[in-house]
C-alpha cells in the first residue's frame, strides 16, 4: 500500500482562489492523503470554503486559529502531520494531477529525503511564462552538496515532498520574508539530510496576483530579506563553496536595486536611507557578488559594488523605456 502523504495548506483570506487549489489537491492521482487546511484567522469566507470541502472529502481536516502568520501556521501543520511525507502548498496556487504520484515514486526509488520539482509562475496582471520545459528529466543528488543544490533550485518550501522525520524538528522562523529559504537552508544543513532528487518539470503553478508579497513596491522588509539571505549564504557556504553559485547575495541586492529604481523621485527620497544601507551591504559582500562564473552576474555585481549610483541610473532609464 502507498504511504500516507500530508499536505499542509495555510489559509488566510483566499476565498476567491481556494476552490481551484482544493480541486487540484483532491483530484490527485495519488489518493492516500491527509489534507490539513489551517485557517489563520481569515476575515473573509475562507473558513466556510474549507468546511464545505471537508464535508465533501473525508481526507480534509480543518483547523482554526487566531492570526499568527504563515510560519507558525506551517509549523502547526508539521506537528499535525501523520504522513511519511509532507508537502506544503500555498492556498492560492494549484498543482498538476500527477505531481504527488511523480514525487512519491521518485522519493521511494531514490531513497531521497526530499523529492522536488520546478514551478511555473503565472502572473494574473501580465502574460508571463518563466518555465517552458515539457520534458521530465531527473537530477539525482549523489552527495549532500549536489542534493542541496537540487533542493534549492526553488528556494521556497512548495514543490517539494519532504520526509516527515527529516523536518519534524525544523521550524519556520518568524521573519516577514525569506523565512521559507531559511527553512530549506536549515534542512540542507541538518545532519539527517543526505539526498534530494529533482524532476525538472513544473508540476506546481505559483500564482501572482495584485499585492503578492514579493511583487509589491519597495518596503523595509526587502532589507530584512537581505539579512536573512546573508545568513543562509553563510550557513550554506560552510558546507561547500559551491553553494555560492545559488547567488543568494546577488539576488537580494538586485531586488532592492530594482524596487528602488522603480520608485518616483519623491518615493526615492523617502527610502534614501534604506538604499544607502543596500549599497553598504553590497560593498561588504563584494566577494560574494564578484566570485561567480556567470559573466553577466559578475558585471552586474561590479557595477553595484563600485558605481552603484550609475547602475541605479541605468536601471531607472531602462524601466522608463
Where are these regions (language model features)?
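Short, well-formed alpha-helical segments that are part of the catalytic scaffolds
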Residues: 13-27
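A conserved acidic beta->alpha catalytic loop
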Residues: 24, 39-48
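Glycine-rich, basic loop-to-helix element that forms the pyrophosphate-binding segment
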Residues: 65-81
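Short aromatic/hydrophobic "clamp" motif used to bind/position activated sugar donors
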Residues: 86
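Flexible acidic/His/Gly-enriched loops in nucleotide-sugar-dependent glycosyltransferase catalytic domains
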Residues: 99-174
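Conserved nucleotide-sugar donor-binding catalytic segment
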Residues: 143-219, 224
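Catalytic core of nucleotide-sugar-dependent glycosyltransferases
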Residues: 202-209, 215-246, 250, 254-285
Amino acid at each position: 500500500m502507498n504511504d500516507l502523504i500530508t499536505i499542509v495548506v495555510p489559509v488566510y483570506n483566499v476565498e476567491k482562489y481556494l476552490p481551484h487549489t482544493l480541486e487540484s489537491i483532491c483530484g490527485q492521482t495519488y489518493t492516500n492523503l491527509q489534507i490539513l487546511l489551517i485557517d489563520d484567522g481569515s476575515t473573509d469566507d475562507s473558513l466556510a470554503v474549507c468546511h464545505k470541502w471537508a464535508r465533501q472529502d473525508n481526507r480534509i481536516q480543518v483547523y482554526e486559529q487566531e492570526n499568527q502568520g504563515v510560519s507558525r501556521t506551517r509549523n502547526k501543520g508539521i506537528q499535525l502531520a501523520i504522513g511519511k511525507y509532507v508537502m506544503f502548498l500555498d492556498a492560492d496556487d494549484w498543482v498538476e494531477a500527477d505531481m504527488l504520484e511523480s514525487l512519491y515514486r521518485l522519493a521511494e526509488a531514490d531513497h531521497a529525503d526530499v523529492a522536488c520539482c520546478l514551478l511555473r509562475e503565472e502572473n494574473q496582471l501580465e502574460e508571463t511564462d518563466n518555465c517552458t520545459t515539457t520534458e521530465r528529466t531527473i537530477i539525482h543528488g549523489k552527495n549532500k552538496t549536489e542534493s542541496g543544490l537540487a533542493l534549492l533550485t526553488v528556494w521556497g518550501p512548495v514543490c517539494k515532498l519532504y520526509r516527515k522525520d527529516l523536518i519534524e524538528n525544523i521550524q519556520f522562523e518568524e521573519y516577514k520574508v525569506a523565512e521559507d529559504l531559511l527553512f530549506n537552508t536549515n534542512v540542507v544543513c541538518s545532519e539527517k539530510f543526505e539526498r534530494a532528487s529533482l524532476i525538472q518539470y513544473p508540476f506546481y503553478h505559483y500564482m501572482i496576483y495584485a499585492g503578492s508579497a514579493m511583487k509589491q513596491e519597495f518596503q523595509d522588509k526587502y532589507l530584512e530579506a537581505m539579512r536573512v539571505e546573508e545568513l543562509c549564504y553563510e550557513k550554506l557556504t560552510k558546507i561547500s563553496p559551491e553553494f555560492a553559485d545559488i547567488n543568494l547575495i546577488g539576488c537580494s541586492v538586485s531586488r532592492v536595486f530594482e524596487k528602488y529604481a522603480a520608485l518616483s523621485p519623491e518615493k526615492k527620497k523617502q527610502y534614501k536611507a534604506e538604499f544607502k544601507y543596500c549599497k553598504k551591504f553590497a560593498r561588504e559582500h563584494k566577494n560574494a557578488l564578484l566570485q561567480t562564473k556567470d559573466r553577466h552576474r559578475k558585471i552586474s555585481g561590479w557595477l553595484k559594488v563600485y558605481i552603484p549610483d550609475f547602475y541605479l541610473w541605468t536601471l531607472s532609464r531602462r524601466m522608463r523605456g
